[in-house]
Every structure is written in structure tokens, then in C-alpha cells.
């Protein structure tokens, strides 16, 4: 009986995923993805697109506490799951 109870406690702790830290994409290139482990209080991933010339965009990615504000001709996407800003 004690073994069953101990097993249930361990399974519960593992399933709760206590203290989950969000992981966002910091950089994405042809060579791969650079992850960023978000600090406490940063519970969003973001990706921005800034048009540098017609058809050409500069991207920024990372962690944030709040979704960045859009500027002229920018697009911003915010999300809350691991690597959702790919």
C-alpha cells in the first residue's frame, strides 16, 4: 500500500510540471535554431517582422513579459508555448 501511494505521489509531481520555464526561439537561421530560456515573469514568446525593403523583412524573436508594440510597417506575433515563435 505504501509503495502504491509513493508511486502516485511521484507520478503526480511529474505530471504537474512544477516550475515550467518557457523556452522561446532567439535566432533562426539556415544553420539551426538558437533557444532562449525565459527569465521569471517573461511568459510570452514574440516574433516581429520589419520591412526593410519591398519583399525583404528583418525578424526579431525572444522572450517578453508583455507583447511588444507594433511600429510603422511592423507585424508582431506573441504566443505562450515553447518555441511557438519559430
Curated annotation (Swiss-Prot):
Q: Where is the signal peptide?
A: 1-21
Tagged with keyword Secreted: yes
PROSITE patterns annotated for this entry? Answer: SNAKE_TOXIN
Instruction: Supply the Pfam families for this chain.
Output: Toxin_cobra-type
Under Gene Ontology molecular function, one entry of this record is:
toxin activity
* Subcellular localization, as worded in the UniProt entry: Secreted
- Which cysteines pair up through disulfides? They are 24-45, 38-63, 67-78, 79-84
Q: Keywords in alphabetical order, please.
A: Disulfide bond, G-protein coupled acetylcholine receptor impairing toxin, G-protein coupled receptor impairing toxin, Neurotoxin, Postsynaptic neurotoxin, Secreted, Signal, Toxin
Instruction: Identify the tissues in which this protein is expressed.
Output: Expressed by the venom gland.
Answer yes or no on keyword Disulfide bond.
Answer: yes
UniProt cross-references to InterPro entries, sorted A to Z: Snake_3FTx (IPR003571), Snake_toxin-like_sf (IPR045860), Snake_toxin_con_site (IPR018354), Toxin_cobra-type (IPR054131)
GO cellular component terms, alphabetically, are: extracellular region
- What quaternary arrangement does the UniProt entry report? Monomer.
**Which family is annotated?**
Belongs to the three-finger toxin family. Short-chain subfamily. Aminergic toxin sub-subfamily.
Q: What's its job? A: Binds to the muscarinic acetylcholine receptor (CHRM).
* UniProt protein name: Short neurotoxin OH-35
Amino acid at each position: 500500500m505504501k509503495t502504491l501511494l509513493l508511486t502516485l505521489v511521484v507520478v503526480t509531481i511529474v505530471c504537474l510540471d512544477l516550475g515550467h520555464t518557457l523556452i522561446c526561439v532567439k535566432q533562426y537561421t539556415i544553420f539551426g535554431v538558437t533557444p532562449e530560456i525565459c527569465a521569471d515573469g517573461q511568459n510570452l514568446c514574440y516574433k516581429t517582422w520589419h520591412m526593410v525593403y519591398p519583399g525583404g523583412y528583418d525578424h526579431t524573436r525572444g522572450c517578453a513579459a508583455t507583447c511588444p508594440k507594433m511600429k510603422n510597417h511592423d507585424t508582431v506575433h506573441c504566443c505562450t508555448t515553447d518555441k511557438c515563435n519559430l
